[in-house]
Amino acid sequence: MATSCNIRVMCRFRPLNEREKALKENQTCVTFPDETQVIVSGQPFTFDRVFTPESTQKEVFESVKDTIHDVLLGYNGTLLAYGQTGSGKTFTMGSAAAESDFENVEQLGIIPRGNHLIFNTIAEESDGNAEFTIKCSYLEIYMENIQDLLNPKNNKQLKIRESKSQGIYVEGLTEEYVASEEDIMELIQVGESSRSVAKTNMNQRSSRSHSILIIAIEQKSSDGSKKRGKLNLVDLAGSEKVSKTGAEGIVLEQAKKINQSLSLLGNCIHALTDSKREHIPFRDSKLTRLLQDSLGGNTKTTLLVTASPHFNNVDETISTLKFGARAKSIKNNVKVNQEKSAAELQIIVNALTKELSILKVYSISLENLVNYFKSSSYQPGNPIPKELEPNKQNLLLLQQQSNSSSGGGGSGSSGGSSNGSLMMKPRSTTPTPPSINRPHSSASTHRHSIAITGTHSKEGSGGGLTSSISSSSISSMSSLSSSIDNDYNGSSLDDSNGSNGLFNPLAIVEMSIEMEKMKEDTQLLIEKFKDEISEITIQYQSTQEELNQCRQQLDQIKEQLEQQRSQFIKEQSLLKESERNATLDSTSKDLKIQSLISKIEDLRLLASQVIQYLERKRLSDDFDIGIFMGSQDGANGDSANMFSLISNSIDQGTYEDDVNIEDIIRYLSEEEVLTMQVKLQLQNKVHQLEQKIQQLVSDLNTTEINYNQSILQCQKFESENSLIKRKFKSMFSSSNNNNNNNNSPPSSPSSKLLIQSSNNNNNFDSNLNSSSLSSSLPSSNGIEQDQQVDHQVDHQVENDHLVNDEDNKLLDENSKLKENELKLLLEIKNLKLQSEKSNDETLKWKDELSIKSALYQNQILNLQNENQSLSNKLNVEKQQKQSSQSQQIEFATKLNDLIKSSEDDKELYRNEKNQMELEIASLKASLDEMDLKNKELQDQLISTQRLIGARRVVKIVRGGADSMKTALATKEVFGQFTLRKTENSKTLFQ
C-alpha cells in the first residue's frame, strides 16, 4: 500500500569566506532561535532542521541518513542540494572529494558517508539469506543536454523514458556494478574529471552543470522475493547573478541555462503546491523531468538548501529559503518496490482458481435459466422448476458434472422429477452483448471482482510473471464462497409465495433495446464533450503561450532599453571627460612646445658661441705655432686640414664616414677635446629636443584621431538608440493592430536631433583639427595665438550648449517612451483579465461536463448485467494467458538480443584495445624522436656557449701610431675568428 509523506527540507548556512571577511560590512543578517527556525532580515522561516555555520558534516549526515536506510528497505530516495553559487552545495554533498580529502574524515560529505553506511548496514544486517547487487551511474545536465560522465565517449543523445517497472530513467546510460565504497568513489572521481567547471568571482571552482549520482540496490531473499531501491544524489548548479559573478562569453551562456532550468524547477514546485493547478510542467526541462518521481511521486525526498549568512547576499538567501518553504508542502506517495515470491503467487493463484470454478458453475446455472426462459415450455406465471433454481444443491451437482466432463465446462444436466421436468440444456453459444464496466462491489449482490496485472521483469536471470494483488482483494476471495452460499440459500423460491411476474421476457427485451439506445446517445454526447474540451484546452494553451511570448518580449525590450540608456549616459559622461582631458592636454602640450622652442633657440646661440670660440682659438694657435713649426709644413698642413674637417663637420652637424675619429682626437689638445665634447653634447641635446618635439606632434595627432573616433562612436550609439526606438514603436504599433486599434503613435523627432548633433559634432571636430594644427606650428605672434584660442573656446562653449539642448530633447523623448510603456502595461493587464475570464468560462464548462458525464456514467452503471461482468472476467483471463505467453516469448527474444549485443560489445572493446596499443606504439616512437632532437639541441647549445666564451673584448688604446697598428691587427684577428666560428655554427645547425 502506498503511503503519503511530505518532502523533508533542511537548511544549512556556511561560514563567512575570506572575501566576505575582507569586506567592511562583514556582518551577518541571520539569527537562529532554535534548531528548526531561522530569521533573515526580520523574516522567519521554519524547516525540519536548520544548521548554523558552526555545524559539522557529521551533524548534517546524521539528520539525512534516514533516507538511505529507507532505500535499503526497498523505497526510492532522493537527496537534493539547492542554493546560491558558492553556498556550499558541492562541499555538503561531497561529490568533488579528492583522494587527499579522505585523510580528513571530518570534511567528508554526504556521498562518501552514505556509501560507507550502505555497505556497513548490508554487512551487519544481512544473515546470509539475501543477495545484494549494487549498480552505480553518474550523469550531468549541461546546457540542457544529458551527458554520461562514466562514458564521455557516449556521444549519442541520451533520452528520458518512463515505464511502470523502472519509473523515469535515462535510456542508454552506463551502469557499473560496484562491490565496495571505494569502487563508488573511484567512479565519482572518473565522472568529476569530465564535469564542466569554471572560475567566477563568487567561486573558484563553480559547477556549470547539474549532476545526479544514481545508486540502485537490489535485494533478493532466499524465497525468491525481491526488493529494489534507488538513491538519487543530486548536486544542482548554483543560481547566479551576472553582476556578482562577472560571467562572460561561454560562462555567461552557461549561467543563463542554469538559471532557466532552476526557474523551471521552481515553476514545477509552485504548481505542485497550488491545489487548483491541474497541469504540472515537468516536461519543460530535462532536470524537472528526471526529478518528476522525486517531486510528488514514488520517492522519499530530502531537500537541503544552502545559503550565505552575509548581508551582501541577503536577497539570494531569502529567495532560496522561500524555495525550500514552498517545497516543504509537497506530498509524495511512496511504496516498497517489491516482487512477491513464488509461494505467495501460488497462494493467490489457488484462490483465484477457486473463485473461477465457483463463478463458472454459477454462470452455467444462469445460462440454463436463460435457456429455459427462451424455450417454448416456459409460460409466464408458471413456477420455475426446482432443478433450475440457483441453490446450493443444484450448484454442487453442476460442479460435479463440469468436473466429470472432458471439456471442463461443457453441457451439464440435472435429474428429472417424477412428473418429467425439463432437462438442463448445455451452455449457449450465442454471442453476448458488449461488456460494460461495473464497480468492483455492490451492496445488493455481495459479489466481488479481482484484477490481476502481470508484467515481465527484465532484470535477473529468469523472467517470471509478477502479480500485484491488494490485501483487500485476497480477503474478499477468501470470503467469496461463504457469501455465494448465503446468496444461494437465501434465493430459494416458494411456489406459493408470489411466483407470478418474476421474469417478463418482453420487459427484458424492451430494457435491452433502451439500454442500447442510451449507450449510443451517451457515447455520442461523451465524444462531443471530449472534442469541445480538447478545443478549449488548445485555445487556452495557445493564448497562454502568446501571452508568455509577449511578456518575454516586453521584458527583453525593457532590459535592452535600460541597458542602452545607462550605456548612453556613461558614454556621454566619458565623452565630456575626454573632451576636457583633450583640451587640457592640448594646452599643456602647447606650453611644452613653446618652452622647448625657447630652449632650442638658446642652445643654438650657445652652439654658435662655442663654434666662434673654437675658430678663434684655432687661429690663435696657428699664429703662435706657425714660426716654430716652419720646418714641419707638411704636418701643419695635415693639422690644418684636420681642423678644417672638424669645423666643417661641426658646422654641418654630422660626421662623414671617411673621417677617423681616433686620428682627430690624437692631434687635439685637452682643451680642444673638452670643447669638442661640449659641442657634441649640445648637438645631442638639440637632437633629443627635436625628437621630443616630433613625439609631441605625433601625440597631438593621435589624440586628435582618438577624439574623432570617440565622436564617431557616439554617433554610432545615437544611431543604435534611434533604431531601438523605431523597433519599440513597431512593437507598439503591432500590439495596437492586434487589439484592433488603428491609431499610430506620433513620430518622434529623434532622427532630426541625431542629424543636428552629428553635424554639430563634425563642426566641432573640424574646429578642433584646425585649432590643433594651428597650435602645433610655432607662431610668430603670441597675440594672434591667444585670439585663436579664445575663438576655439567660444566654439566649444557653443557646441556644449548644443549638446545640452540635444540631451534635453532626448530626455523628452524618453518620457514619451515611458508613457508608451505604461500604455502597453495597461493593455497587458486587459489581456490578463480577458485570459482570466476565459479561464473561468473553461472551468464552468468543465464543471458542467463533469456533472453531465457523472450522471450518464451512473445510468450506465445501473444498466449493467451480471452475465456481462462474468463474460468480461473470462475474456480477461484468456487475455492474461495470451499476454503471459507473448511476454515469455518476448523475454526469450530479448535475452537473445542481449547476448548478441554483449558479444558485439566484446568485439568492440577488443578493437579499441588494439587501437590503443597502436597509438601507444606511435607515441613511443615519437618520444624517441623527441629525445634525439633534444640531444642535438643540447649539443648545439654547448657549441654556442663555447663560442660565446671564446670571444674576447678588444680595447682601443689611445696613444701613438704603434698602438693603433696593434689595435687594428687585433681587430682583424677577432673578425676572422668570429667569421670562422659563425660558419661552423651554421654548418652545425644545418
Curated annotation (Swiss-Prot):
This is Kinesin-related protein 5. The lineage of its organism: Eukaryota, Amoebozoa, Evosea, Eumycetozoa, Dictyostelia. Interacts with actin. Composed of three structural domains: a large globular N-terminal domain which is responsible for the motor activity of kinesin (it hydrolyzes ATP and binds microtubule), a central alpha-helical coiled coil domain that mediates the heavy chain dimerization; and a small globular C-terminal domain which interacts with other proteins, vesicles and membranous organelles. It comes from Dictyostelium discoideum. GO terms for biological process: actin filament bundle assembly; microtubule-based movement. One of its GO terms (cellular component) is microtubule. Residues 466-485, 733-781 have a biased composition (Low complexity). It is found in: Cytoplasm, Cytoskeleton.
